[in-house]
Design a protein with these regions (language model features):
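Conserved catalytic-core segment of nucleotide-activated headgroup transferases in glycan assembly
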Residues: 118, 123, 311-388
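Active-site-proximal region of nucleotide-activated glycan assembly enzymes
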Residues: 4-7, 33-44, 53-76, 211-214, ...
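Catalytic binding pocket for nucleotide-activated donors in carbohydrate/polymer assembly enzymes
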Residues: 279, 292, 297-307, 390-392, ...
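C-terminal amphipathic helix plus adjacent low-complexity
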Residues: 2-34, 343-345, 464-519
Length: 519
């Protein structure tokens, strides 16, 4: 299948960032070397973010480049954050709570990703002998029922020495970005086939410099402290593109600590963050995920098919739990409980298409009083914006965006999605699934092309799909897509979605044991 212009731009962006970092300059350090501050390899830490989010607008794709006022607001936020952290009192209370024995360190800086991918592994590992789990967060509250002893904060490993180290790293980063901004030899590297991308790409890089000098300097200093003072046996990251996790895995790898990347979301040719994979192993959903990562130049021998921990919690909903769910959202007896996994429009270049699809879903649902549509907002979504599209339809209710959508999928009769990772959860559970994909929407191609779900392309087709749900509860949708669903699951999911947690734990234990045997 021919790649879209958007995907080709993402791949070109990744190629450029890699080439810029490695380009030789006679008698001068390369960009990768310029941004190396002892063991802190900042170009490598920032590269995935740069290629995925910052450079595509300079190539004419991705989210629009920030206006001057937008950049100034970002600079003000960065400066406010720097002032706040400069005044932050030193706190090393979690150092004393670090467990004795070998520790598996889970990098849980994005709460909903940590909840879906890391917490199932942390909980299961905590019940075993051997590796002790520690999940490192950024002041996230401990989930109800979780073992508080396993939750640490980067800011409770914030010693006076760590603060001084962060300041040194920040000064080194400021100097490196200043050289890039003011030296014509380095600026000339920021080009595509001889065409200069300065100032467009240059402004994006320098904008990233604010983040690097403050936020990433602090995370790098804490990572250096954790690696040198506590030395975990293995590190686990759920987000290969997040510069915060990359700071930890980069410093861990430099110290000989094995690192594991656990796949979070669906990935295809657009997932160019995997071009910057630098861990020892990648734990992926299924055989097709392995093929995708290999296509992004991840060595095949470093990819392990484990299945996803997020799927283990999908199974086993009881009749009482399902009735409690229906009662909570006041679903009338006889109505179908249809859950919509909504998506944020913030910083999305296809936001107008997204809003049109949401509006079509709400209009179709409102016209079917025997359905109750339960809208589960994305954790980063502007709920007021989405709620306004639903008007005052009595059979549309909104849930708390902070809750776990997997619980909703397990309890519902049918699922409506816009292409997020939760789409696979619904397919795994065999739920009738509708995924609108209007012309111009680029974020659900994996599921759209699978044939495993219903894909209405217009407002009228969305209405027709909801009509099918109302008529037979989704039986016809499931029957029409059954064969494609079975094929899709065999390619993308290990053992029907079960056992991912145990296989990830086995991978961690093996990596830690192998590292120990080398010392």
């Amino acid at each position: 299948m021919e790649l879209s212009t958007f995907v080709r731009a993402l791949q070109r962006s990744a190629d450029l960032v890699q080439a810029w970092g490695d380009a030789p300059i006679p008698g001068r350090p390369s960009l990768r070397e310029l941004f190396a501050f002892e063991d802190v390899r900042e170009w490598d830490i920032l590269a995935a973010d740069l290629a995925l989010y910052r450079i595509p607008p300079a190539l004419g794709h991705g989210r629009p480049a920030r206006s001057r006022w937008g950049r100034q607001k970002r600079q003000l936020r960065a400066l406010k954050s720097a002032v706040r952290h400069a005044a932050r009192r030193c706190d090393d209370s979690d150092c004393a709570r670090w467990p004795a024995g070998p520790v598996a360190l889970f990098l849980g800086f994005t709460p909903y990703i940590a909840r879906d991918i890391l917490l199932p592994v942390v909980a299961a590992l905590g019940a075993k002998r051997g590796l002790r789990p520690v999940i490192l967060t950024e002041d996230s509250p401990t989930p109800a029922g979780a073992d508080d002893a396993t939750f640490h904060s980067v800011w409770r490993h914030w010693t006076s020495a760590t603060r001084r180290d962060a300041q040194r790293i920040g000064r080194a980063a400021r100097k490196a970005f200043s050289v890039l901004a003011n030296d014509g030899t380095y600026r000339a590297l920021i080009a595509d086939h001889g065409r200069s991308l300065w100032p467009e790409a240059g402004e994006a890089i320098l904008d990233l410099g604010l983040y690097a000098r403050h936020e990433i300097a602090r995370f790098s200093a804490v990572a250096r402290h954790v690696v040198s003072h506590h030395r975990p046996a293995v590190m686990v990251s759920p987000d290969v593109a997040d510069a915060r996790t990359r700071a930890f895995t980069s410093l861990g790898a430099a110290a000989g600590i094995p690192t594991i990347e656990v796949q979070f979301g669906a990935c295809g040719p657009e997932a160019t963050e995997w071009r910057f994979f630098a861990a020892d192993r990648a734990a992926v959903w299924g055989p097709q995920s392995r093929d995708v990562l290999v296509s992004h130049h991840v060595p095949d021998e470093q990819v392990v098919v484990t299945g996803s921990p997020r799927h283990d919690v999908l199974f086993g909903a009881t009749a009482a739990e399902i009735q409690g769910f229906r009662d909570r959202f006041r679903v009338p007896a006889g109505n179908l409980a249809v859950v919509m996994g909504s998506t944020s429009s913030a910083n999305n270049p296809d936001a107008p298409v997204l809003l049109a699809m949401k509006r079509a879903i709400f209009v179709a649902a409102a016209a079917r009083p025997t359905l109750t549509l339960i809208v589960k907002p994305h954790p980063l979504e502007d709920v007021n914006e989405t709620r306004a599209l639903a008007s005052e339809a009595v059979n549309i209710v909104f849930a708390d965006g902070r809750e776990d959508i997997r619980t909703y999928i397990a309890m519902c009769d049918a699922f409506v999605t816009l292409g997020s990772a939760s789409t696979l959860d619904a397919v795994v559970l065999g739920k009738p699934t509708i995924c609108p994909s209007f012309p111009g929407w680029r974020w659900s191609e994996l599921f759209v092309n699978s044939g495993a779900i219903a894909v209405p392309r217009t407002v009228d087709e969305v209405a027709s799909a909801f009509g099918e749900l109302a008529e037979d509860g989704g039986v016809s949708i499931l029957a029409r897509h059954a064969r494609a669903r079975d094929t899709f699951l065999s390619e993308w999911v290990q053992d029907g979605g079960r056992g991912g947690t145990d296989r990830v734990i086995a991978l961690l234990e093996s990596a830690a044991h192998h590292a120990e045997s080398r010392t």
